[in-house]
Amino acid sequence: MASFHTLKIKNITKQTPDCSVISFEMPASLSKAFYYTQGQHLTLKAIIDGQDTRRSYSICSSMVDHQWQVAVKKIPGGVFSSYVNDVLQTGDTLEVMPPSGKFGVPISTQEKTYIAFVAGSGITPVLSMIKTHLAKEPKARFKLFYLNRTVKSIIFKEQIEQLRNQYFGRLEIFYFLTKEATISICEEKIN
């Protein structure tokens, strides 16, 4: 049975006003236990206001990057998400369980086109998939349809645009916004 390990937070950054990305330091002694595949998640644990609180968050990094990152969007009234976004700091520690879950497809040697329809924070496991499949499958193509409320609420927008440039012609992105008029990054508005 998997157990929790204490991991130090290497960095915590804001992606949007209500979404933080936690980057964990990974000791060499734990790197094998924390090996992951695209689409998996980490279960985090902290004592918050005297209560043992646990939540699972999709990994948004890729093993190609040799990083362990999760994004946590603040939910109104959310105990753990508020703790991460308002209290947690670089250098703090969290209890973390090794990766689990099977949301995704294995790496292929054949030419494939992947298509993902994502809304808001649902981008987190898909970002890991985009990075991994495009890096490990030279003939792969990826089409991302990404729905958000506003431009400022687009999680990982800068990173996604960097990936589009890095994998020019292999990564297509279609943004859709529900609370703003059509703008240059968006071809149409969803009502």
Predicted regions span which residues?
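Ferredoxin-reductase
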Residues: 2-92, 148-150, 178
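FNR/FR-type flavoprotein reductase catalytic core
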Residues: 82-191
